[in-house]
């Protein structure tokens, strides 16, 4: 017998194997981080939760498409997601028909994550991605498995110099392949739900059952299974955004596994590390939302003009570039003198401070009151200036610092909590 070239040609297909000892600690860490994020979200108010869900699901739709080189209109996506979440859509543009269909796919996947994944459900998702029956100008089979004797190949390169990265099972095998896949998806196995999401991702993308849209539907199935794993119909982190940040690595690991037999340990490690990245990014964003909420609660009675409120909100939401007098004047359409008075007023009120960078122009940053990720207390942190940060005066052992850095990545604890670990 000829040695198998592609993973589905192995006799053991689709009975994947992996080395538990290589993934067990990583999986435990991911599950802990999931719990921390869900706990943090549950402590927030309904409006804050809803806003965060809107932003995450909007990003997920945009990045899932962007991985395939498709750029959707962010305002249309946000409008459609908001409507499906039952949020206020006043002032938002109405989403076009195509965007509405794409959003419906993700909504169905995560809001009905516990519903069985069936052939009909997959066909409905596929039809929503290709409402005209075409991929670009090419007619494709829609809402049905791909057909014909032509091999389904993933290729790159110029015409005549194509490189074949993967070849999927022939179309005559698809009914059997997909029936087996769907039985497994809907079965009550003892496997960890996060590992199930990883395996489903790899399995479906290797079957490649449709003429087009396989990557987007693969990641939709992943979102569905991660929603099951989280026990939540809301998404608080975006796997597609994390994949896009390492798109090259994503395609490299899929190509490697597609050619190297049934041991999928490298894929599971990559998948779990990518979830870690997604959750860490989400934790940072949520902490920012919490900090912004605490800030406005503290300054509810502080007299501020419209220009100051506008710029403060922009700083909390992530201002591009540095804030100085000239940028303030440009953003608020006012004079440099007025901009300087606005800034000096905020400095006196303890809202802005000199960034300490020096140079010809003074740059300003928020004098932030952060919330401790361990106890929730508000405190001032200047982590970008370690000499002035609360962390600086507390002596911690290297092992303790490593432990805290792993448990609370890119975050400071308040001084009270740090002192509990001091030596």
State where each predicted segment sits:
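Short linker/helix segments within small regulatory modules
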Residues: 396-409
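Short cysteine/histidine-rich zinc-coordinating motifs and their immediately flanking basic loops
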Residues: 384-390, 401-404
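Short cysteine-rich clusters marking metal-coordination/redox-active sites
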Residues: 372-375, 414-417
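FIC/Doc superfamily catalytic core
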Residues: 1-368
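Short flanking/linker segments adjacent to small metal-binding domains or redox-active Cys/His motifs
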Residues: 417-423
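Short Cys/His-rich local motifs and their 1-3 flanking residues in nucleic-acid-associated proteins
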Residues: 377, 393, 419
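Residues immediately within or flanking Cys/His clusters that coordinate Zn2+
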Residues: 369, 388, 411
């Amino acid at each position: 017998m000829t040695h198998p070239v592609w993973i589905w040609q192995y006799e053991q297909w689709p009975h994947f194997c992996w080395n538990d000892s290589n993934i067990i600690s990583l999986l435990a860490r991911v599950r802990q981080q999931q719990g921390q994020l869900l706990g943090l979200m549950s402590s927030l108010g309904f409006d804050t939760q809803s806003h965060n869900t809107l932003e995450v699901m909007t990003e997920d739709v945009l990045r899932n498409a962007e991985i395939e080189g498709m750029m959707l209109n962010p305002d249309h996506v946000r409008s459609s997601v908001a409507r499906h979440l039952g949020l206020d859509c006043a002032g938002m543009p109405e989403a076009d028909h195509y965007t509405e269909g794409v959003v419906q796919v993700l909504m169905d996947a995560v809001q009905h994550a516990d519903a069985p994944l069936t052939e009909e459900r997959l066909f409905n998702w596929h039809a929503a991605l290709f409402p005209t029956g075409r991929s670009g100008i090419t007619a494709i089979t829609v809402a049905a498995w791909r057909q014909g004797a032509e091999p389904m190949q993933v290729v790159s390169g110029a015409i005549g110099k194509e490189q074949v990265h993967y070849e999927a099972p022939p179309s005559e095998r698809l009914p059997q392949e997909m029936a087996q896949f769907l039985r497994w998806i809907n079965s009550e196995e003892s496997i960890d739900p996060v590992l199930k999401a990883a395996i489903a991702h790899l399995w479906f993308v290797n079957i490649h059952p449709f003429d087009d849209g396989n990557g987007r539907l693969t990641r939709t199935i992943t979102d569905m299974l991660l929603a099951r794993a989280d026990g939540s119909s809301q998404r608080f982190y975006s796997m597609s955004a994390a994949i896009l940040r390492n798109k090259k690595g994503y395609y490299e690991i899929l190509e490697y596994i597609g050619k190297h037999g049934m041991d999928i340990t490298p894929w599971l490690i990559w998948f779990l590390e990518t979830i870690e990245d997604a959750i860490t990014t989400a934790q940072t964003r949520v902490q920012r939302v919490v900090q912004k909420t605490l800030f406005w609660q503290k300054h509810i009675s502080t007299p501020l003009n419209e220009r100051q409120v506008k710029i403060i909100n922009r700083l909390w939401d992530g201002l591009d570039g540095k804030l100085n007098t000239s940028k303030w004047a440009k953003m608020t359409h006012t004079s440099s003198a007025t901009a300087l008075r606005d800034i000096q007023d905020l400095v006196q009120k303890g809202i802005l401070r000199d960034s300490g960078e020096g140079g010809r122009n003074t740059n300003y940053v928020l004098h932030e009151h952060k919330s401790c990720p361990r106890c929730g207390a508000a405190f001032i942190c200047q982590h970008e200036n370690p000499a002035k940060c609360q962390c600086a005066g507390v002596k911690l052992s290297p092992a303790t610092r490593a432990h805290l850095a792993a448990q609370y990545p890119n975050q400071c604890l308040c001084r009270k909590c740090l002192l509990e670990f001091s030596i």
